[in-house]
């Protein structure tokens, strides 16, 4: 009210994200740690959920729809070139496949059918009878219709889609709370350039958290068979591995499972 902003703006995903950043900065400041000064940057062009480009700006939703619906790579490249940097355009066009919402929806329906309501209530973010609403919505024929049916002011579509990920990954409220309270227990290296490699050496020598170049240094395939014996750091990483497997299942027949065990960090030439 003091800023004379429309109330609906407070419920937009980027606003929520900004507020969480401010909250985290406030916590760090109370601990006496130096924090950067936050800056509010006005969004230009397309809004977060817009489905059409505005000028030279497009939302992530628009880019995903263009990628999914384009008839061929040449058409996709032509559509993307005015909207994204050349390197991003090349990366999108060169990608061979993307997760299929229809496949995700079939996994979701089975998960809902095979989990008791009491079990659903233990999933992060599911409360206030939402599990019953989800069970009633599984007869909708598509992922988008399922999400649309559950969407409300309290549960925007982006939140519903996050809850779907939580459910498919069996993200237990109690376990996630333990992870949140513990904070990061390792640093996983995904990519680096020559400068990053030097920085990683310093982190390895001075930092308090272990660096993971390969997941096997913390969790091997045998460990995954005995989740009850895992420590908290291993449980964190196993959830990461499960997320990669979920994406592979959504890609279809050509994707390999357990890709986290197949790839080393990417080295980028300067």
Residue ranges and their predicted role:
Residues 1-270:
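Active-site cores that bind ATP or allylic diphosphates and position pyrophosphate for catalysis
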């Amino acid at each position: 009210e003091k800023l004379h902003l429309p109330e609906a703006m407070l419920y937009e995903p980027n606003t929520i994200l900004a507020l969480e950043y401010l909250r985290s900065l406030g916590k760090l400041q109370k601990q006496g740690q130096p924090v950067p000064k936050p800056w509010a940057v006005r969004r230009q062009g397309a809004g977060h959920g817009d489905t059409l480009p505005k000028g030279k700006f497009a939302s992530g939703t628009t880019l995903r729809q263009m990628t999914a619906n384009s008839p061929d790579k040449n058409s996709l490249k032509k559509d993307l070139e005015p909207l994204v940097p050349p390197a991003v355009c090349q990366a999108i066009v060169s990608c061979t496949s993307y997760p299929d919402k229809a496949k995700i929806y079939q996994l979701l329906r089975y998960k809902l059918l095979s989990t008791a309501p009491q079990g659903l209530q233990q999933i992060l973010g599911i409360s206030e009878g939402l599990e019953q609403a989800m069970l009633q919505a599984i007869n909708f024929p598509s992922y988008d219709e399922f999400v649309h049916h559950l969407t409300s002011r309290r549960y925007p579509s982006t939140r519903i889609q996050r809850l779907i990920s939580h459910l498919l990954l069996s993200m237990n409220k109690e376990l996630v709370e333990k992870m949140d309270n513990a904070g990061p227990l390792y640093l996983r290296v995904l990519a680096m350039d020559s400068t990053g490699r030097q920085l990683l050496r310093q982190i390895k020598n001075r930092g308090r958290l272990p660096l993971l170049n390969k997941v096997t240094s913390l969790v091997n395939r045998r460990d995954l068979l005995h989740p009850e014996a895992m420590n908290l750091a291993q449980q964190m990483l196993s959830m990461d591995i499960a997320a990669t497997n979920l994406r592979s299942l959504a890609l279809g027949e050509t994707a390999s499972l357990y890709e986290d065990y197949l790839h080393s960090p990417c080295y980028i030439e300067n």
